[in-house]
Amino acid sequence: MSDTLNQLAEVLEARKNATPDSSYVASLYHKGLNKILEKVGEESVETILAAKDAAASGDCSELIHETADLWFHSLVMLAALGQHPQAVLDELDRRFGLSGHAEKAARQPSA
């Protein structure tokens, strides 16, 4: 896993025990999962809009910025639920080289 993701995971974990006024992440944890999920939703919409703008203009700088925000808030969500980013990377590794159709079919419940 990248050093950046590991370092960020460590900081996110440490912020769980911090006072809400000490950092943005600590304040999110203090407000609870619903607030964190609200931020993930907000950043998702902003990322989609930035992608549409990038497609029209060819400038991807805002798309990169919004994607970083989305990833960040997704990592906060995972940490709030006791998950480490490595779990997502492991899932991506598991899927690598597997056709998207085969992977989706493997997730379908049997009838």
Curated annotation (Swiss-Prot):
Which SUPFAM superfamilies does the protein's record reference? all-alpha NTP pyrophosphatases
Give the reaction(s) catalysed.
1-(5-phospho-beta-D-ribosyl)-ATP + H2O = 1-(5-phospho-beta-D-ribosyl)-5'-AMP + diphosphate + H(+)
Pathway per its UniProt entry is: Amino-acid biosynthesis; L-histidine biosynthesis; L-histidine from 5-phospho-alpha-D-ribose 1-diphosphate: step 2/9
Q: Which UniProt keywords apply?
A: Amino-acid biosynthesis, ATP-binding, Cytoplasm, Histidine biosynthesis, Hydrolase, Nucleotide-binding
Instruction: Mention one GO molecular function.
Output: phosphoribosyl-ATP diphosphatase activity
Which Enzyme Commission numbers does its entry carry?
3.6.1.31
A Gene Ontology annotation in the biological process aspect, one of them, is:
L-histidine biosynthetic process
Report the enzyme's class at the first EC level.
hydrolase
Subcellular compartments: Cytoplasm
Q: Which InterPro entries does the record cross-reference, listed alphabetically?
A: HisE, PRib-ATP_PPHydrolase-like
The Gene Ontology CC terms held by the record are:
cytoplasm
Q: What family is this?
A: Belongs to the PRA-PH family.
Name this polypeptide is given:
Phosphoribosyl-ATP pyrophosphatase
Taxonomic lineage of the native organism: Bacteria, Pseudomonadati, Pseudomonadota, Gammaproteobacteria, Pseudomonadales
